[in-house]
Amino acid sequence: FLFFLFFFLKDVSWIDNLKLRVSYGIVGNQNGIGNYTTLGLADNKGYEFGDTFQMGYLPGKELSNPNLKWEQSATANLGVDFSFFNGRLNGTVEYYNTHTKDLLVERSLNASLGYTTMLDNLGKTKSSGIDLSLNGDVIRTKEFTWSLGTNFSMYKNEIVRIDDTLDENGKPASQVAQGWIIGEPINVYYDYLVDGIFQYDDFDITRDGTGNLVYTLKNTYDSNNDGVADSPIDYGGAIEPGMVKVRDNNGDGKITADDRVPIRKDPKFTVSLSSTWNWKGFDLFMDWYGVSGRKIKNSYLYDYNSGGSLRGKLNGVKVDYWTPFNPSNEFPRPSYSADPAYLSAIAIQDASYIRLRTLQLGYTFPARLLKNTPIHKLRMYATATKLLTFTE
């Protein structure tokens, strides 16, 4: 189809260039394989023998694997290069699809073997993406030109298989402890989804015999599937206002490790937009860059050593945390002795942003002013980077 389309478009006057590119290749990767990883090595160790210090050898600290081989990645590319309207609009569209097998991964071993891991060829992954590049002259006159350029990239990857282990359904098994989930991207967090902070309105509040407040979660779970909430969500412990509220993702009425979900770290797409103006020797260049859908775990919100955990360390208490007089729905109440529950889930934040990466203003001196000098061309400019960033 594409061949016939290109054939019929060859005489269209406004098309300067239209080129189809197709490629396929297989490449190898040996990163992680040392010079002697496939061999059984011995470590030189010293020991006391009587009154004499002797040198000897012990089995190496890493189990060798004589069957190691390169990773293999097979990639197919389909691209179109084009130029229209006497070069005023040009660009490239490209789609790629990659399948990788025999990934170099540290396999977990039973400690009774004397080793806990071994480098091995495991698993399969697949990835695909689209790259778009577009450049055009919006205005082109003798004294003034204005050009725009944009780049767009969207990429995703997925774990197909980790090893030969199967789950109870006979399908390739995930390894949750390592963050490797079948059908999910390679780079993910595995955590709870946060629905805010518990407020007073979430509880029925009473007093016990000694006058202390007793907080009982209101019924929000429909155990009979009849459309009527008849029981509270079971958090496995006491819940009070100011604590983190997480989602019962599997709908069983209980908050357990099974409610954790993979949360993609990598952005859904990236985009850039550049603009260049030229007028009577002056030029102005502006470059914007945006990232959408990226997730990060902010250590300053959960890690005690980095200032988080809301226990008064460094800047941890400077966030908008919950108190009875400031019922924030963003951060839990602080604690003097222990981290609030589910704090790591609170720390996962949307890292999408738009940034003015570069702003440059320049002036090129006319040739007539340089006529009697050894200088053939002179341009002065000032550049600023990362001037503005817009993010949540």
Residue ranges and their predicted role:
Residues 48-90, 118-141, 181-197, 264-269:
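Outer-membrane beta-barrel signature, preferentially recognizing the C-terminal barrel domain
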Residues 24-28, 95-101, 136-138, 152-158, ...:
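Transmembrane beta-strands of outer-membrane beta-barrel pores
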Residues 4-18, 31, 85-88, 139-146, ...:
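Short loop/turn motifs that connect adjacent beta-strands in outer-membrane beta-barrel proteins
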Residues 10-72, 90, 94-125, 163, ...:
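Solvent-exposed loop/turn elements at secondary-structure boundaries
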Residues 34-37, 120, 137-261, 385:
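Conserved small-residue
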Residues 230, 238-241, 291-385:
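Extracytoplasmic gating/loop element in the C-terminal half of outer-membrane beta-barrel translocons
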Residues 1-3, 22, 78-82, 93, ...:
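Residues on the lipid-exposed face of transmembrane beta-strands in outer-membrane beta-barrel proteins
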Residues 11-13, 26-41, 103-107, 111, ...:
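Outer-membrane beta-barrel and related beta-rich outer-membrane complex signature
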